[in-house]
Amino acid sequence: MTYLKPNCSHLALLPSKSSNGHPLIARNYEFNDELEDFQLIKTIVEGKYTHMGTSVLSFGREDGFNDQGLAVTMSSCGFPVGADKCMRRPALEGLQYWAVIRSLLENCRDTREALLFLKGMPIAYNLNLILLDRSGNGALVETLDGRMAVRPLDETSPLPYLHAANHAVIQELASLEPEAMVHSLKRYDYIKSIADSAETLTVSQLKSMLLAPYPNGLCCRFYQDFFGTTKSMIIDPMDGIIELCWGGRAENGWHTYRLSDPLPASEEVISISCEPAAPDMFRFAPNPFA
């Protein structure tokens, strides 16, 4: 699916790391504005958990949370996998990320169930998948050419947060791909520097991180290079809400949606700002986790 470059950043906070005492996920998604769905969808399927998230090809999900309090976000782990000649060839027959995420949201109540569900799932896409539930248990799940590694997140973890950009950070997988794109390394280090410098983070601080321009922030405007911020979000699985900003611009507004409320059909006009990308953004550098 498409010839995108690896992109996206996300951060999960334990309740002890967030100022409101809730588990939170902050997330940016980068893509091309002409191919992005720009849809938030609430899905109610008989016999499945109700969930809300942004779509890909309308049917798939790129992120979201369900009525049991499980939230899921993703970024590519290395170069994106797909059938297009410009993409990395899949190492096995299996699922694209958008099928994985929708399956988790519809079938899993919490991080523990999601990890068990993933073990039996053939995943062809190379993923950095973040799971976080309303109880404050989470995990980073990395997949690379059919291999999987997991870093759990709970109150016994060395750090009260975890994050990912577009390279492997769990050593057993990072050693298989010892280089990463410069922009991924810079975004990862930016998140770490902010998170390590504060005892707790507020929702307002997270929003500022998401909309601050790269390289001193996470927002990218390089849409022609398939690397423009199409959506920014904060998910609170405890309260069952998502705060969503389209197009990487504060001028488009942050909108709050609660899963327990109706989601009527609506449309709005947003604006984006396009800029050329510096070529050295996409060069490779050593992955410090390899």
Briefly describe each language-model feature range.
Residues 1, 17-24, 28-119, 123-128, ...:
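C-terminal, well-structured catalytic/ligand-binding subdomain of enzymes
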